[in-house]
Amino acid sequence: MTVSVAMQARIDKIDAHLNEHNLRVEKLYGLYPILKSNSNDSTKSLACSGAKGSGFSWIAFFFPYAVCTQIREFSFFAFQASFYIIAAWIHVITGKDFSTGVAFGICIAYGYWFPYLRYLALKENRKEYAVFQSIIFGLFLSFASIIPSIVIESVFIHN
């Protein structure tokens, strides 16, 4: 697995934070990362900013479909599909289209979450896809994940 110097620095910060505060990274509902205490299983907020924070991954902000595919984090597509379906139903009911806001929100979330997801992938020794493969496969999966919302809007919105 190839990890950039910047990402390795983020992973090292995450590891130091986890060790210092007796925490572990888990995925809630298999979808997004959370921190849990090793002693009492309580949930803690992710450390994303500040001196001990993991920071923001701009590559994950601009290309979440590709980086998540590369590390085999396919829950991204379920997360994306869920929010687009909700946005489609809101569009059907209210006439207001929030799909652009949903896309922007997903990109921001994965910009912050990606260092933790990368940490989990490294910890679990997940085999990675090559960059070109992850871009092509990720685009295909991303399109497939928005098909349900397209169908909902096509069937229920009559212009």
What are the residue ranges of the model-derived segments?
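Hydrophobic alpha-helical transmembrane segments
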Residues: 77-78, 101
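Membrane interfacial helix-start motif at the N-side
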Residues: 33-76
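Hydrophobic, membrane-inserted alpha-helices
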Residues: 59-65, 80-90
